Amino acid sequence: MEGVVLLHKPKGMTSHDCIFKLRKILREKRIGHTGTLDPDVTGVLPICVGRATKIAQFLTSETKTYEGEVTLGFSTTTEDASGEVVETKHVDRVITRKEVEEVLAALTGTIEQMPPMFSAVKVNGKKLYEYARAGQEVERPVRTITIHEFVLLDEREVFEGENISFRFRVTCSKGTYVRTLAVMIGEKLGFPSHMSHLVRTASGEFVLEDCISFEEIEENVQNGTVESIFISIDEALSKFPKMVVDEKQAEKIKNGMFLKNELQITAPFITVFDKNDRCLAIYEHHPKHPGMLKPMKVLVNNQELKL
């Protein structure tokens, strides 16, 4: 049993909860997710099973797309709807569509972001949420993130009321805290705010429409069709930069052979496939030998390499 399961993560569960439940359903210990989703967030959660856990780090590095809602008028301890109210300031003016779009444009591109106190980022060996639960606030490391697209989905021309909400879609780099983006939007508009709703609609090439629920997974297990829920390792990696090697090279890859970057691929890592369209290994640029590639992960053993 191996491959990638595209789970439609339900609300109220942590990513670790999802792993624990899937281990029980599939009776498989080797399971890992490819990027944490907060309990309040639903949507795409790719989960690696069996030998596919070797490729989890590469799927984690992909860009993510979310659709969500920002509410202006009050902020919370957790920056989302689950936290306690910290500050209240009613929206005492009309906010125009143009204003919101200008704020989203200002937050597009390469920006800096400070992770929220209620997050799993570690400071001095401790997770930030551990400090937060103890009532302590510590200095947090600022991180650089990339917002590829940030668009307003709400069609209204003006927003008014004591508390106002509007919907958005954002495509961003790994490590982006979307709830912090919601707070940043409020700051630029002059009001406390929080993220009132969020769903991840895509993680790299994986989209929400292709995800399945726990109930569907259990049904496939009961029907003896569990293999149908998996995306193969080869397919999961097929969209990444790729080299194809001959049989002679394929035999040597298991021993960690270096490869020439003949295609001059500039991406941080390169998948290496054989002529039967099997992914043999994942390579990266050699730090000391320009133009050469060295293996990061070898995905096949000796027996599997016999062609």
UniProtKB/Swiss-Prot annotation:
One of its GO terms (molecular function) is tRNA pseudouridine(55) synthase activity. One of its GO terms (biological process) is mRNA pseudouridine synthesis. The active site is at residue 38. The keyword Isomerase applies. It comes from the Bacteria. InterPro entries: PsdUridine_synth_cat_dom_sf, PsdUridine_synth_N, tRNA_psdUridine_synth_TruB, TruB_C. Keywords: Isomerase, tRNA processing. It catalyses: uridine(55) in tRNA = pseudouridine(55) in tRNA. SUPFAM superfamilies: Pseudouridine synthase. Its EC number is 5.4.99.25. Responsible for synthesis of pseudouridine from uracil-55 in the psi GC loop of transfer RNAs. PANTHER family: PSEUDOURIDYLATE SYNTHASE TRUB1 (PTHR13767:SF2), TRNA-PSEUDOURIDINE SYNTHASE (PTHR13767). HAMAP family: TruB_bact (MF_01080). Belongs to the pseudouridine synthase TruB family. Type 1 subfamily. This is tRNA pseudouridine synthase B. It comes from Bacillus cereus (strain ATCC 10987 / NRS 248). The lineage of its organism: Bacteria, Bacillati, Bacillota, Bacilli, Bacillales. The gene is truB.
